Regions:
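Generic detector of well-ordered alpha-helical segments enriched in charged/polar residues
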Residues: 6, 50-54, 270, 274, ...
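C-terminal effector modules of nucleic-acid-centric enzymes and ribosome-associated factors
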Residues: 1, 11, 137-291
């Protein structure tokens, strides 16, 4: 029966994109294979549930995972110190690394990595640090610091798998707060592509998501989000949806991909003004809107 259950479950999860699935036959009532190996299941050679939970690598570290750091706080106690505080979402950073601040695109070099226990030469995912830079760059809370040459996706329109958690349905067109890491913006569901039957994983047509529904939703937000797909980076691929009136979290989302955006057609005045600003005020860091 155990082998039949394994086979049935593997078939069910084929479409769920799981990298690693483990099975443990156990009895919660009798404690079999929960903490100690069960004498009643000599045919099972694997680990107990507790041993598996203590040894499994939930999020394996990868030396090549891109560095992502969302600024949570700008620390400026005096004119001689300006640091950007936050928790490293993924990857690692070294003193001397060249970074890019988003959305401005300005570059600098990491001068110091400051922690409560002293300065470091290197910091890794999950560590709370303050970064100081060689150059004075205007970076605010919610903006992102990444390494040069390894940029995230940037968009105002994206598709996400959404878990809806409120009694009031998710309605396309209704404005919500979208919290992506430390960045808060506003946005709305443009359309609901489908929702899932959680028992069969069948995609069903739907114009709304009710409480406990899971669905594929296209979003439009008012400010550019810098992200990696959730399957590649949970730290920058997740967001929460907050009701603007009650401030209650009503949903959670996992970004799958950016949507194709229509090329913005700028007027002659906008093009000329952009050229003038970049020519005469380069220190403003204005981007070339023709690219």
């Amino acid at each position: 029966r155990y082998q039949a259950i394994k086979k049935e479950y593997r078939e069910f999860t084929e479409s769920l994109d799981f990298d690693d699935i483990r099975f443990v036959p156990l009895s919660a009532l009798n404690g079999d294979n929960v903490v100690e190996e069960s004498e009643n299941m000599p045919w099972y050679p694997g680990a107990t549930l507790m041993k598996l939970l203590n040894t499994i690598d939930v999020e394996p570290q990868n030396e090549f995972t891109p560095f992502r750091f969302q600024v949570q706080y700008v620390n400026r106690p005096n004119l001689d110190f300006r640091g950007f505080a936050g928790t490293i979402a993924s990857g690692h950073i070294l003193v001397g690394d060249t970074i890019v601040a988003l959305p401005s695109g300005k570059e600098s070099v990491v001068k110091e990595i400051v922690t409560f226990d002293g300065n470091l030469e290197r910091a890794d995912k999950g560590m709370a640090v303050t970064l100081t830079l060689e150059d004075e760059i205007d970076i605010s809370r919610g903006e992102m610091i990444v390494k040069k040459g390894n940029l995230p996706h940037s968009t105002k329109e994206f598709n996400a798998t959404v878990v809806w958690m409120h009694e009031n349905e998710l309605e396309p067109g209704r404005e919500y707060f979208i919290k992506h890491g430390s960045k808060m913006t506003t946005g709305h569901a443009q359309s609901i592509e489908n929702k899932y039957d959680v028992n069969t994983m069948e995609k069903l047509s739907s114009s709304q998501l009710a409480v406990n529904d899971i669905g594929n939703v296209n979003f439009v937000v008012d400010e550019v989000l810098h992200f990696d797909p959730y399957k590649d980076n949970r730290g920058t691929g997740a967001f929460i949806i907050i009701d603007r009136l009650s401030n209650i979290t009503v949903g959670a989302g996992m970004i799958t991909h950016a949507l194709d955006q229509k090329t913005h057609e700028y007027s002659a005045f906008e093009l000329e003004f952009n050229t003038l600003v970049r020519k005469h005020f380069p220190h403003w860091g204005a981007r070339d809107i023709t690219k």
